[in-house]
Amino acid sequence: MKAARIAVLAALVVAGWATDARAYDPATTHAVLTERAALASELHRVLGRALSRPLGLFEPVALSLDQLPPDRAQSLEGRLATLDPSSGCTAGPDGVAPALAWVIAGSIIAKTPAERGQDFFYDPSRGSGLSNAGGLASLGNTLGLLLDAGGGFRAFFTGTQFNMTGRPSTEWLHAPENDVGLEAFHANLETAIAGEQPQLRAGALARALLALGGVLTVLEDAGEPAHVRNDYRRAYLGTPGPSPFDRGSRFEQFVAETYGRMGLPTAVKPTERPTLMAFITAADGQGLADRTQRRFFSDGSLPDDAIVDHGTTAAEAMADARGSLPYAYPRLPRLELKVMGRRHYAYTRDKRRLLAYQRVPGRVRFFLDDAVYADTARVLLPEIAGYGAGLINHLFRAEIRVDATGGLALVSVVGARGAVKKGEIRVFAEDAAGLRKALTTVQPGAAGVRVNVPAGTKKVAAVLRGEDDAGEFVAVGESAVK
C-alpha cells in the first residue's frame, strides 16, 4: 500500500513539475545570439587570414566523425542529428557546413544531453552554481527527465540524472569532459594547424568552432536572470504551457516567441574585457553575470508578497518586501499602494520596468509580466551579443604572422596582451599534397624569428599555445610560400 502511494505521488510530481534547465531557447535565442556575436567579431577575418579560409565564416568546413574515438563520435553524431535542418546550421550528407554554421550548432548542442543544463548556472555574489536540490520538486524533475529524455531507470537509481544542483558554469567552461568547452576549443584549434592531413585539420577546425559555440552558450546564460540568481524552482518548475513537459521559463519563452531567429538587433558593438573570466564575472562588477544579477529580477527572486491590512503603513509594507529579497540588488523603489486592484510597475532610473505589482485584498503581489520581459530583453539581448563578440575577439586576440619567401619564413606573434609568458611556436611545412610535417620549434618574439624552409614547401603554418597578461591563448597563422 505504501509503495502504491509513493508511485501515485511520483506520478503527480512529474505531471506538475517536469522540465529541464535550458535557459535561453537553444534553437532560436542561443542560435541568433551566437550568430550576431560571430558576425560582429573578428572571426571572419581570422579565418580568412590566419587559417587560409578565404570565405571566412562562410567557408565550407568538413567534419569527419571517424577521427574521434567511437564513444565520442557516437555522442556527437547523435546530438548533431537533433538539429532542425531548417535552422541552417546542419551539415550535408558529406559532413560539410559553413564555418558559421558549426559555431551556431555548437551553441545549440551545448546543453545536450539535458542534464548538462545543471552546470550552466553561476551566482556571482556567492561564486556558486545551481543549488536547488531536495524535496519533491527534485524527485519530480528527475523522473520527468527519465520519462522525457529516455534516461532510463539505471540512470535514475545510480544518481546520474539532473537533481537541481550543479557546478558553477565558470567551472564547467574549463572542464576536460566538456567537449564543447574551452579546453576542446584550444586543443582542436591547435590540431587545425598541426594536423598532418587536410581532412584531420578540417575536422579539428569544425570541432573548434563547435566548442566556440559551446563557450558562447555559457557566456550567454550569464545574461539570463534566473541563471545568475540561483532560480530553478520558480523559473523552470512553474510550467506555463499546456503540457507538463512544456520546457522553459516564461521569460525565455517570451524571448523566443517575440524575437525568433530574425528579430534580435543586428547592430552589435563588441565589449572588451581584460580576461576571459572577466566577461562573466570580475571584481569591477562588469562581468555579464555581475551586471545581470545586479539589474534584473527573475521569477523566483522577487520580493515575497507583502501583508497589508488596515493598520499597515506603506513604509511597513515596503520594509517587509525589501527584507524578503534574496539579493541586495536590484533595490526595490517606492511603490504606489493606495489603489486596490490596479497593476503598477516599478521603474529603474532609465525608465525600464523592473517588476509589476498589484495590491489585492490583504497583500501586495509582485510578479513579472510581458511588459517587464520586453524591457528586460530590450536591454539584455544586445548586451549579451556584444559580450559574445568581445569574447570571440579575446580568444583570437593573438595571431602568428608568417611571411614565407623563397627559402626563408619570418614568424612573429602579434596581438598578445603584454609579453608572451610561456609556450613555443611550432612551425610546419606543407607539401603539394597538403601534408604537413613539423619543421622546427622557436621561442615567440614580437620582432620575429627566421626559419629555413625546405625546397618543395608550398605553405608554412605555425601554432602557439601560450599565455599573456590576459591569460591562456592559442595563436595560429599560415601563409603560402611566395
Please describe what each predicted stretch is:
Residues 7-16:
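Bacterial N-terminal signal peptides
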Residues 21-214, 218-221, 225-371, 375-378, ...:
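N-terminal, motif-rich segments that launch catalysis or mediate targeting to/interaction with membranes
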